[in-house]
């Protein structure tokens, strides 16, 4: 069975290490760790296909801006006939603490425009991995916060490594095992922003 891992972000060098691009950062790290081939541009996304253990996986980074992420993802899903239960979207989340991971299927989009775009075209019944980027300090604009770079990139990279270490658990029926493994690892990591 084919699985689709999607990272949300904005294309362009100026966005590379911004909080809003943590989804892209996760997909890039997965690609390098599991030796996927280089990305190719198809369906208005950067795509790479490979395997994680015995699971066939497509990695995708929509090459539209965040607000239009749904169109390329919908195109990939329809072409490869990927069931919604096999789609996992990695994205930034301002409503949870820095470097905290939450996983859920369906639900609202909490104002996240990338998720809104996907929901409009595919519905909400896919998996989301929410990567906490923290809420901006008093007086800081939310758009400035999400489009600025991380203060503690080391903590971000450690959290991404924890995700990769247990990523094959995401392909199992009980995704709570992944959540608990990653949560336990993060608990012992310095994640001060």
Curated annotation (Swiss-Prot):
Keywords carried by this UniProt record: Cytoplasm, Hydrolase, RNA-binding, tRNA-binding
Sequence positions that bind tRNA: 15, 65, 67, 113
Keyword tRNA-binding recorded: yes
Main location per the UniProt record: cytoplasm
Annotated site location: Discriminates between blocked and unblocked aminoacyl-tRNA: 10
GO molecular function (one): peptidyl-tRNA hydrolase activity
Active site, renumbered: 20 (proton acceptor)
Site keyed Stabilizes the basic form of H active site to accept a proton: positions: 92
Enzyme Commission number(s) of this protein: 3.1.1.29
Catalytic activity reported: an N-acyl-L-alpha-aminoacyl-tRNA + H2O = an N-acyl-L-amino acid + a tRNA + H(+)
Subcellular compartments: Cytoplasm
Alphabetized InterPro entries for the sequence: Pept_tRNA_hydro (IPR001328), Pept_tRNA_hydro_CS (IPR018171), Pept_tRNA_hydro_sf (IPR036416)
GO cellular component: cytoplasm
GO biological process, one term: rescue of stalled ribosome
CDD domains: PTH
Classification via Pfam families: Pept_tRNA_hydro
Domain of life from the UniProt record: Bacteria
Protein family according to the UniProt entry: Belongs to the PTH family.
Role of this protein: Hydrolyzes ribosome-free peptidyl-tRNAs (with 1 or more amino acids incorporated), which drop off the ribosome during protein synthesis, or as a result of ribosome stalling.
Subunit: Monomer.
The protein's name in its UniProt record: Peptidyl-tRNA hydrolase
Species assigned in the record: Ehrlichia ruminantium (strain Gardel)
Upper classification of the organism: Bacteria, Pseudomonadati, Pseudomonadota, Alphaproteobacteria, Rickettsiales
């Amino acid at each position: 069975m084919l699985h689709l891992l999607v990272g949300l972000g904005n294309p362009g060098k100026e966005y590379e290490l911004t909080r809003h691009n943590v989804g892209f950062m996760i997909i890039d790290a997965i690609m390098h760790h599991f030796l996927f081939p280089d990305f190719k541009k198809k369906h208005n996304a950067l795509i790479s296909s490979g395997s994680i253990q015995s699971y066939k996986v497509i990695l995708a980074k929509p090459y539209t801006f965040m607000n239009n992420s749904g169109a390329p993802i919908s195109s990939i899903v329809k072409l490869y006939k990927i069931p919604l239960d096999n789609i996992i979207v990695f994205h930034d989340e301002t409503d949870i603490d820095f470097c905290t991971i939450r996983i859920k299927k369906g639900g609202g989009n909490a104002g996240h425009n990338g998720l809104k775009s996907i929901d409009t075209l595919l519905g909400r019944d896919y998996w989301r991995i929410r990567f906490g980027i923290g809420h901006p300090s008093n007086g800081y604009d939310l758009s400035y916060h999400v489009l600025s770079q991380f203060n503690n990139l080391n903590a971000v990279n450690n959290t991404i490594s924890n995700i990769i270490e247990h990523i094959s658990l995401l392909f199992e029926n009980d995704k709570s095992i992944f959540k608990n493994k990653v949560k336990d690892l993060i608990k012992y990591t310095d994640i001060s922003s």
